[in-house]
């Protein structure tokens, strides 16, 4: 992926940058692998806002992604690398030898014409999916299962990868992108390599309109509201919030308050939390 910048013809183009989409080889999605995606606009079934700052945005077709990689021991050819509006990563269209078509997350350096395969006996190559116990120490992996057969749930964002650091008993230890170190059952599958399109973090929107196209509405600070609207509101000019610490619009502690359930069963599998130095 390359980054394209603009001359400052307008204030919006002065700072803006976009992907050059040089890695995209097919512009229209595979029709059989798409479905309609209803946008909830941040509302629940009663029409009440449950997630603020959402609404508008361009309509999207959802691409059905194969996170399970459960088509074992059947080779597939990479037919195209495509854009997906629902995620930062690119997706790869696979043609299996038996005629089935599927989308997967496109790893970095995966080329059109390459062959990928999943299974216990799959070779150690980019894009192949193997059980964690078959992957060598020090390897980069992504799309990692937490429960065998459920499908990849971790490390799916553009440019992300986890590292296999140890194997002991029925568990494999991984270092995640957040620096958290945790154990995962050895029979869980993961895909070799890191997710592509890593330069997406270097893009700049340049103007508010591009954020609105993505379905994001303005995020207004509580300190500039009235007291009726937010606990931080009110006062003369730029007044302090008048509390020991910041809170949400509903008065609960925010910005650093722990939200993880202390009794969560998976806590015993986490060796080092992400927020520990």
UniProtKB/Swiss-Prot annotation:
Function: One of the primary rRNA binding proteins. Required for association of the 30S and 50S subunits to form the 70S ribosome, for tRNA binding and peptide bond formation. It has been suggested to have peptidyltransferase activity; this is somewhat controversial. Makes several contacts with the 16S rRNA in the 70S ribosome.
Single annotated GO MF: transferase activity
Record-level GO BP terms: translation
PROSITE patterns listed in its UniProt record: RIBOSOMAL_L2 (PS00467)
The species this protein was found in: Gloeothece citriformis (strain PCC 7424)
Span list, region Disordered: 1-20, 27-55, 207-277
Subunit structure, interactors included: Part of the 50S ribosomal subunit. Forms a bridge to the 30S subunit in the 70S ribosome.
Protein family membership: Belongs to the universal ribosomal protein uL2 family.
Feature: compositional bias, Basic residues: 207-220, 259-277
A Pfam entry, by short name: Ribosomal_L2
InterPro entries xrefs: NA-bd_OB-fold, Rib_uL2_dom2, Ribosomal_uL2, Ribosomal_uL2_bac/org-type, Ribosomal_uL2_C, Ribosomal_uL2_CS, Ribosomal_uL2_dom3, Ribosomal_uL2_RNA-bd_dom
NCBIfam families: rplB_bact
Compositional bias (Polar residues): 27-48
Keywords of this entry: Ribonucleoprotein, Ribosomal protein, RNA-binding, rRNA-binding
Gene: rplB
Record GO cellular component, one term: large ribosomal subunit
Protein name (record): Large ribosomal subunit protein uL2
Signal peptide coordinates: none
Record HAMAP family: Ribosomal_uL2_B
């Amino acid at each position: 992926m390359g980054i394209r910048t603009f001359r400052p013809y307008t204030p919006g183009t002065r700072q803006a940058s976009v992907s050059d989409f040089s890695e995209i080889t097919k512009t229209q999605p595979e029709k059989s692998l798409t479905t309609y995606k209803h946008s909830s606009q941040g509302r629940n079934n009663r029409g009440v806002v449950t997630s603020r700052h959402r609404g508008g945005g361009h309509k999207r077709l959802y691409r059905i992604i194969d996170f399970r990689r459960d088509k074992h021991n059947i080779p597939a050819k990479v037919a195209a690398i495509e854009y997906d509006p629902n995620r930062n990563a690119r997706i790869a269209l696979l043609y299996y030898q038996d005629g089935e078509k599927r989308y997967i997350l496109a790893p970095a350096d995966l080329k059109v014409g390459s062959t990928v395969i999943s299974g216990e006996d799959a070779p150690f190559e980019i894009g192949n999916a193997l059980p964690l116990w078959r992957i060598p120490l020090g390897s980069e992996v992504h799309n990692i299962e937490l429960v065998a057969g459920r499908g990849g749930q971790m490390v799916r964002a553009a440019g992300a990868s986890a590292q296999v650091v140890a194997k002991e008993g029925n568990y494999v230890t991984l270092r995640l992108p957040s620096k958290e170190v945790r154990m995962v059952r050895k029979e869980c599958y993961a895909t070799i390599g890191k997710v592509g399109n890593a330069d997406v973090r270097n893009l700049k929107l340049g103007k508010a309109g591009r954020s609105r196209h993505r379905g994001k509405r303005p995020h207004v600070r509580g300190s500039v509201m009235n007291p009726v609207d937010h606990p931080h509101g009110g006062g003369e000019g730029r007044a302090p919030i008048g509390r020991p610490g910041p809170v949400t619009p509903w008065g609960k502690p925010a910005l650093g308050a722990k939200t993880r359930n202390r009794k969560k069963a998976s806590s015993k599998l986490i060796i080092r939390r992400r927020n520990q130095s």
